């Protein structure tokens, strides 16, 4: 400690021992305007897009007790809708929905904002640990009956939100007529 104190006092007493401050010619100063010669770190970033048009959003055209019609493609049984794809979802009822069955929603990039869950012909309560796992990962969950979940999913996609859906087809009595058939 005494040596450090002695060196400090010597350093203050003899300014010639100090190293002159180094001024870097490329370092920005107050009031400095950027020029093309400046370092890349201080220049604006430019983004060029490979695909100019936004990808077509997923829309549920119709549903029945056997499955769903999504963007004109028939999907049989329960399915998970992701921003640009549809996958079969291996659940039989709302009781089969676990943390593992939702894991595909939090593994994706860009991150999904909200998952709409259709539980059949009635709104059913999901297990609390499943909802808590989604909440911890920053994903909102909206649980509805399948007819309302389909409408909510379409609405959120139309708004441009990053949305996922986990849908179980409703049993026999309910169905949505395809929008194309309803117009005829």
Curated annotation (Swiss-Prot):
Main location class: nucleus
GO CC annotation, single: mitochondrion
One record GO biological process: mitochondrial respiratory chain complex I assembly
Transmembrane parts of this sequence: none
Lineage top rank: taxon: Eukaryota
Keyword Mitochondrion: yes
Keywords: Disease variant, Membrane, Mitochondrion, Mitochondrion inner membrane, Nucleus, Primary mitochondrial disease
Compartment(s) of residence: Nucleus; Mitochondrion inner membrane
Quaternary assembly: Interacts with NDUFAF4, NDUFS2 and NDUFS3.
Family indicated by similarity: Belongs to the NDUFAF3 family.
Pathological association: Mitochondrial complex I deficiency, nuclear type 18: A form of mitochondrial complex I deficiency, the most common biochemical signature of mitochondrial disorders, a group of highly heterogeneous conditions characterized by defective oxidative phosphorylation, which collectively affects 1 in 5-10000 live births. Clinical disorders have variable severity, ranging from lethal neonatal disease to adult-onset neurodegenerative disorders.
Function: Essential factor for the assembly of mitochondrial NADH:ubiquinone oxidoreductase complex (complex I).
The protein's name: NADH dehydrogenase [ubiquinone] 1 alpha subcomplex assembly factor 3
